């Protein structure tokens, strides 16, 4: 994959993650999944909306086609490790009376291999359930479709086993985990003493746990990064560092780059990162399982996508007439235990008209007919019409 595009997606991910940080709960995203979904919408935008996507997603307006191709290549690359379960899927769901532009629809099918279907609960939820291996059941509710004319949904699933699993017999069933706000939560603490990649600098400690791997594709690992200082500000500082200088993150994760902070780098506290070295580490890591639901609109507006949440004709490549993004949500399942890691993600972009489409009511089957007083509510006549008599 193009290293510049990797940095771009990583920058977007840590910017977004930082904006969702909450002292009272966990947060988490699958940045590639969100980027994928927003890229599909960006492909149907123009003028001010396209400029907003360019700013938020970090691509050149003139390089939109190249960005779409790079987005798809990420999914293709990630599938090439046969020891890991990985899948990614795109979909478009629209009201039957909402006409999509043929060119955009064909582009979505050709580039993203998107599933196309009616905006109905059952097929949408079946798609999500299938593509996330059952991790999200009935994710979309009937209220989510109210006023919606178009919904773009991307799903991603990942499951991998540790190359060197944790011994369940060494897991301490009753241990403590200290949250940002000072609460102490009970946890099951896994532990191992083993040789592994490890790095430490003035901001953090980090270790890297490899997953089982086959083939010449991605070599998946988990990074566990622990701020040196307690509190949410220390965590935010690390994420800011990753988003402002994603090339440093890439060096940290790939093991390239200098072993010591660069003398020509940024000021103290923002130095380059040391390269990891393999050494014996005594690691204690809590077993955890997260199921998160995020409303991404505030964060995306902060990143520059504000214009896309207002009705305009700048989505004309998708459909003629005013159109706007009404909602962007992200759901994440993440479980880490002695055996490995399982993750599933769903991003939903819901779109609506600035003026709601007129409801269609075709009375061509039995109906109830009332004559009533609108002041008192008195019903003068009520009838079930099942035959019509004389026309």
Region spans (language model):
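Short loop/turn microsegments at loop-to-beta-strand junctions
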Residues: 25-27, 207, 366-368
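Non-catalytic, conformational "gating/processing" segments within enzyme and secreted inhibitor domains
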Residues: 24, 64-237, 256-355
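Short, cationic low-complexity segments
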Residues: 240-262, 356-361
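C-terminal soluble interaction/assembly domains
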Residues: 332, 338-391
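Beta-strand-rich assembly/attachment modules of structural machines
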Residues: 52, 59-62, 67
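Flexible propeptides and autoinhibitory/regulatory segments associated with cysteine proteases
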Residues: 1-52, 355-356
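Hydrophobic/aromatic-rich, well-ordered segments within soluble, folded domains that form packed cores
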Residues: 28-46, 147-161, 378
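Extracytoplasmic/secreted cell-surface and envelope-processing proteins
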Residues: 49-53, 148, 232-234, 292-294, ...
